[in-house]
Amino acid sequence: MPAEPAAGARRRISWALFLAALVSYSWFINGVGGPNPLSRIALTLSLLEDRSVTVDRWVELFPASFADKSRVGDHYYSDKAPGVSLLALPAVWLGDMLWRNVAAPRLGAKACDLGPPTAKGCEPSRVFVLTWIAGLATSALATALGVVLLFHLALRLTGDAAGAAFAAIALGFATPAFGWATAFFGHATAAALLLTGLAVIVLQARPDKTALGAGWAGLAAGLALGGAVAVEYPALPAALVVGALALWRLRGMPAPAAAMAVAGAVLGGLA
């Protein structure tokens, strides 16, 4: 097995992979104004501005493109899993503050002409800019971190830095992950969380793990896998498969450490 590179070299490779991926993803704007991202950003904005989960005013603002919705009584709701909308809250709050106080005043009238032909106006333009920011803070960031995580996972398993870097680059730039990383959908974030859960299990489920360390590792894996399902409900089967792998890998661990790992995973998954 080839010798692993020194810690400094690993950090440099990690930063190079992360920055290359994040800058590449941020250069593109994919799906903004479409039904899927619109449904997600509407929930984020409703939580921030209205302290509500209803999306009525956004349905009224985008009647032609707001297709991903459910109606209960007199109100409309996003029909998407809420996870990615919740994760985007801090970035959208900050982005909206900068948009209102910095970007929009400098752009002047141009700030109201950024939306598609079907939804021109200041408010649609603001929504489209915030959708792009939300995508950067979730899909793009999660995928860039996933690229780095895969590099470290492959490096630990093989000891081959070149092979690990190739695998990470292939994931980030030569698979559909690139496309999903440029859109405010749930796909990329859910995939990155599944990969995180898998990496924690593979790297941390060791016979020499202390009970406390196993508990923290289980908590991290549970949070990642549960988060993936909260972002995209169809991620549940994949999360269950990864969870089954975790149980299988617990066989070689001492009973107290295995019990703590399971308890942490259950707590994290339910959180």
Regions found by a protein language model. Name each.
Residues 80, 130-141, 166, 170, ...:
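Membrane-embedded glycan-lipid processing machinery
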Residues 49-137:
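Interfacial juxtamembrane loops and adjacent helix segments
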